[in-house]
């Protein structure tokens, strides 16, 4: 038996126009549609990344605001306690 027997049984990768190509005839997506979907997914990923970054920045700002409000409330509570006689300065 010769080593080259069966060498050309599979279609070549650049033979996408052939309707007898088993992969494309079975309904698999074409190279162009895969590229379009990949570009779409990359755009979506970029949009989501930007949105998460903005949300993170807003959350950091709110956390700092919350901390400053907490500190102000503790100071006010201490002031009220001193003025009402519950604690000493």
From Swiss-Prot:
InterPro entries: Chordopox_Fusion/A27. Keywords: Glycoprotein, Host-virus interaction, Late protein, Membrane, Viral attachment to host cell, Virion, Virus entry into host cell. Residues 1-29 are annotated as: Disordered. GO terms for biological process: fusion of virus membrane with host plasma membrane; symbiont entry into host cell; virion attachment to host cell. The keyword Nucleus does not apply. It is found in: Virion membrane. Glycans are attached at residue 18. Residues 9-22 have a biased composition (Polar residues). It holds the Pfam family Vac_Fusion. It comes from the Viruses. Homotrimer, covalently linked. This is 10 kDa fusion protein. It comes from Orf virus (strain NZ2). The lineage of its organism: Viruses, Varidnaviria, Bamfordvirae, Nucleocytoviricota, Pokkesviricetes.
């Amino acid at each position: 038996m010769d080593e080259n027997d069966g060498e050309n049984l599979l279609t070549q990768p650049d033979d996408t126009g052939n309707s007898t190509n088993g992969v494309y005839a079975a309904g698999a997506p074409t190279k162009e549609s895969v590229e379009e979907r990949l570009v779409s997914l990359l755009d979506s990923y970029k949009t989501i990344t930007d949105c998460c970054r903005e949300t993170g920045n807003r959350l950091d700002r709110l956390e700092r605001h919350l901390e400053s409000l907490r500190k102000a409330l503790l100071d006010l509570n201490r002031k009220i306690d001193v003025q009402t006689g519950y604690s000493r300065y």
